[in-house]
Amino acid sequence: MKEATMYYIGVMSGTSLDGVDLALMDFSCAQPQLIHADFYPMPPAIRQQISTLCNSGTTTLQALGELDHQLGLLYTDCIQQFLQKHRLSPEQITAIGCHGQTVWHSPNSHYPFTMQIGDANLIAAKTGITTVADFRRKDMAFGGQGAPLVPAFHQALFRKPNQATVVLNVGGISNISRLLPNEEVIGYDTGPGNTLLDAWIEKHQGKAYDKNAEWAKSGKVNTDLLADLLDEPFFALPAPKSTGRELFNLAWLNKKLQKHTALLPQDVQATLVELTAQSIVDQLNQIETELDRHLLVCGGGVKNCLLMARLTALLPQWQVQTTNDYGLDADYVEAAAFAWLAYQRLNDLPGNLPSVTGAKSAVSLGAIYPKEKDVAA
């Protein structure tokens, strides 16, 4: 691989808690290029700690601090494996953009805040690579929701002058970026993506996810439960809006199920797929345009064939594709986005879109942790 100063590594672990995505991006050309990408499973013990924290909202300072340290070490280990696998030296990488792990996101509280953990000091010290992290709080300091941040990257890569493009990311939470010509970009969370599906099958079958949606396909959608789920006030909020596991979790689902105790677990799973699909479709149906409509899907939800089939069936006016068709692996769009955000930060360029987050202005995002190699690392 050539020597370069335009290689950036993006590191992302999302609300699905399945693992850590790494993407090596090259920004030396007008069109950013994904060079390598890999996935590293989340260790079960760390996954459980994060899940418990997100679902309960309570912990001790000791436990939170130790989890912050553990995640910093985990990200470091993933990066070092990635460098070794692809025969890269730290000197070839300009910077790492590490999102961290969101454990709480509360943009509408009296004192708005968001918390991502995974100590970037450890990453910079042990890799010897400048690291950019803490991307969301600067946007919130300027009055924004702190999310979603990826639409700015979507705009840079996917916006076209002659078509209505929407990028749909289905991770733990689903979010869309509306990229319409001659309009401000709008991007926001639509509701749950995989998080409820994964939590429900883990509870009943001990599996991390519903492979090929086989369990969901064995069930039937319960329209009464679906109506109760869609009655959640979040779905009626105007954009921009953001949400996370602090709302859509097993506690929320169990409360909704109190009126539906006779349902089979697989019927609940089928209904949760429909919830994800319907909450996405409800937002897309608000778009009025005479242009060709293209929906580009990315994230783990691309692998849910039932969800993809439902989106295609419910959106006959849209051409439903994946970002693979546009040259960017659907599994690694978010990781690539945080590499791009690190590039933007080091070049003092904006990383947010006020029309998306609600911030007062476009600003560069992220705190910089300069490379200072720990020789004992």
From Swiss-Prot:
GO biological process, one term: 1,6-anhydro-N-acetyl-beta-muramic acid catabolic process
A GO term, aspect molecular function: phosphotransferase activity, alcohol group as acceptor
Catalytic reaction(s) noted: 1,6-anhydro-N-acetyl-beta-muramate + ATP + H2O = N-acetyl-D-muramate 6-phosphate + ADP + H(+)
Entry annotated with the keyword Transmembrane: no
Gene source species: Pasteurella multocida (strain Pm70)
Gene: anmK
PANTHER family: ANHYDRO-N-ACETYLMURAMIC ACID KINASE
Aminoacyl-tRNA synthetase is among the record's keywords: no
Name the record gives this protein: Anhydro-N-acetylmuramic acid kinase
Function comment: Catalyzes the specific phosphorylation of 1,6-anhydro-N-acetylmuramic acid (anhMurNAc) with the simultaneous cleavage of the 1,6-anhydro ring, generating MurNAc-6-P. Is required for the utilization of anhMurNAc either imported from the medium or derived from its own cell wall murein, and thus plays a role in cell wall recycling.
Pfam entry (one): AnmK
Domain of life of the organism encoding this protein: Bacteria
Family under the similarity heading: Belongs to the anhydro-N-acetylmuramic acid kinase family.
